[in-house]
Design a protein with these regions (language model features):
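Intrinsically disordered, low-complexity polar regions and short flexible loop motifs
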Residues: 1-201
Length: 201
């Protein structure tokens, strides 16, 4: 019987700078930059205290919270800016049998000041009104290179385009939408493999 889970951490807060993460007083990430992920770590089920500090410091945490880890799961813990402060969003990967002839992808919106978004793949509307902190359903796509566009919902205004979103068959991906609409960089997408693709229990 599986008695553990996997978790990785993502710094998705544009304003926090590099961070150190402590779980139950033990440092699990050092100088985790904005847009960076840790590797997956094994973790036992239970409640944990999770504290975030500016990198290199151990006083005045940016955030202190609790997380409940359930056995037999694969988590991404995303540190996000919610518009008034910072918080964690815990995202569970769905374990599934992966068809080797298809790629699976979902969209996760972590930008607090982005508008509602419509998602287009190869100029086909695949998701409407994606809101902040929403985790979209999985889409099944042909492997290969795809054109990704994010548009302001119900409009023709493109606010991000990635013409080279490359997906492999038999793999599952999450597309994390991060960034601050108010700065010059704007929105960005991170497209890592999900742990369900390669982790074993």
């Amino acid at each position: 019987i599986t008695r553990f889970s996997y978790i990785r951490y993502l710094n998705a807060s544009p304003s926090s700078g590099p961070i150190d993460i402590y779980v139950n007083g033990r440092r699990v990430a050092s100088y985790l930059n904005y847009r960076a992920f840790t590797e997956y770590m094994k973790v036992l089920p239970g409640y944990y205290r999770i504290a975030v500090f500016r990198a290199g410091t151990t006083r005045n945490p940016i955030s202190v919270s609790r997380m409940n880890v359930i056995a037999n799961r694969v988590y991404t813990a995303a540190f996000i800016n919610n518009g008034t402060g910072q918080e964690w969003q815990f995202i569970t990967d769905t374990r599934r049998v992966l068809n080797q002839n298809r790629a699976f992808v979902r969209f996760i919106q972590l930008s607090a000041n982005a508008p509602l978004l419509d998602v287009y793949i190869d100029d086909r509307l695949v998701l409407t009104d994606l809101d902040f902190q929403e985790v979209g359903r999985y889409l099944s796509l042909a492997p290969g290179r795809h054109n990704l566009k994010l548009k302001v919902a119900a409009s023709a205004r493109v606010i991000l385009e990635d013409p080279n979103m490359t997906l492999q068959g038999g793999k599952a991906y999450s597309v994390y939408i991060v960034g601050n609409m108010g700065d010059r960089v704007g929105l960005q997408v991170l497209i890592p493999l999900e742990g369900t693709t390669y982790l074993s229990f």
